[in-house]
Design a protein with these regions (language model features):
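Charge-rich, well-structured scaffold segments of protease-associated domains
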Residues: 1-139, 155, 172-173, 181, ...
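Short amphipathic alpha-helix segments
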Residues: 196-204
Length: 347
């Protein structure tokens, strides 16, 4: 069984890829982990050491470090915390605290099990009833999401041969009107090598080694984020051009650009659904957010229906600027007050 475990902003996750005939044994292991974790004392120190090393290694991954620092400033507490944790918290955690956290947060009320592959539904249902039918636990109570922080610019000074630029701006929530128009708009900017950011910053001018934009959303928030990895000498021009492309998008998209962007999104959707693992993950996410699973046709049709007017309407209601910007590198950059609304401050 190839497996993985993860923590996110508002949930824990377990995943696995395996031969279909091994599903009963795999679900037995998952059942044991979520209902009766052993958490052997002798292994906790080894895991703590690895996690502390991951924190130190963040200094060797400037792109991720910039993202962590941006999220800490952009999202409301406690949702702005990194899944890496912090050194003080990791050192203070012991087995009793972890077991108490398990009792508090792990329950069947919002648990979702998604299985995709060469399996029969009735057999999966019988396994789930046998292995999880007696699961007890109170529903976890998450705090209200709160408000996104006021837009600001912050710089983290690091003596490096690289410069990192990251930004975030509020957008439409998952499932709200304009959600698919928002996805298409961001795809036009930077989800592939055909996006405007890649073409303008990297292909035409050679300003950076990496650039992209993404749209992320759940039922509590929506966020447009962008990243540029460049050199200190080209950082200011890269930032200026990045902001310029964000502000230029409304009213400038051609029908050909729109068609290409939607085709790329639909191709990625189809290719992703060919993997049982991706299908299981998307089904679980849909159920978590919507309480139902969207069909491939539903998503495909929603993307197809997005028009140029829809994109411009989205951009009118959710402009990419003002935004929150963080840079990481040798020196701070010049950022217009109209872009961030608040003066720069040290990170």
């Amino acid at each position: 069984i190839r497996h993985g475990e993860w923590t996110g902003m508002d949930r824990f996750g377990f995943s696995g890829s395996l031969i279909a005939s091994k599903l009963p044994r795999a679900l037995e292991l998952v059942s044991s982990m979520v209902q009766e974790p052993r958490l052997p004392e002798e292994e906790i120190e080894n895991i703590r050491s690895v996690l502390l090393q991951d924190l130190v290694a963040l200094n060797d991954n400037p792109a991720r470090r910039a993202s962590v620092e941006l999220n800490r400033r952009y999202y409301p507490a406690p949702f702005n915390r990194s899944s890496l944790g912090d050194a003080a918290g990791l050192k203070a955690t012991d087995r009793s605290r972890m077991l108490a956290l398990h009792r508090e947060l792990f329950g069947p009320q919002r648990a979702i099990l998604s299985v995709a592959g060469k399996v029969k539904a009735d057999e999966v249902f019988r396994l789930v009833e046998r292995l999880f039918g007696g699961w007890q636990g109170a529903p976890a109570q998450l705090p209200p999401f709160g408000r996104i922080s006021p837009h600001e610019y912050a710089h983290l000074e690091v003596d490096s041969a690289q410069a990192q630029i990251v930004l975030a701006s509020p957008s439409v929530k998952f499932g709200e009107e304009g959600y698919y128009a928002g996805k298409v708009a961001v795809s036009l900017l930077g989800s592939s090598m055909f996006g405007r950011l890649f073409m303008e910053l990297r292909e035409k001018r050679g300003l950076c080694y990496s650039v992209y934009a993404r749209h992320g959303a759940n039922t509590s928030y929506g966020t447009v984020s962008a990243y540029v990895g460049t050199t200190p000498e080209r950082a200011q021009e890269s930032l200026d051009l990045l902001v310029g492309e964000l502000e230029r998008l409304k009213g400038s998209v051609t029908q050909a650009e729109l068609a290409r962007s939607k085709t790329n999104m639909q191709a990625s959707l189809v290719m992703g659904e060919e993997s049982p693992g991706s299908r299981a993950a998307s089904n679980a996410t849909d159920w978590w957010l919507l309480g139902r699973v969207r069909s491939l046709k539903e998503v495909n049709d929603a993307i197809s229906a997005v028009s140029l007017d829809d994109v411009d309407s989205f951009l009118s209601r959710h402009p990419f600027t003002p935004c929150t910007i963080l840079t990481l590198g040798r020196a701070p950059l010049e950022v217009s007050s109209s872009v961030t609304k608040h003066r720069s401050q040290p990170a």
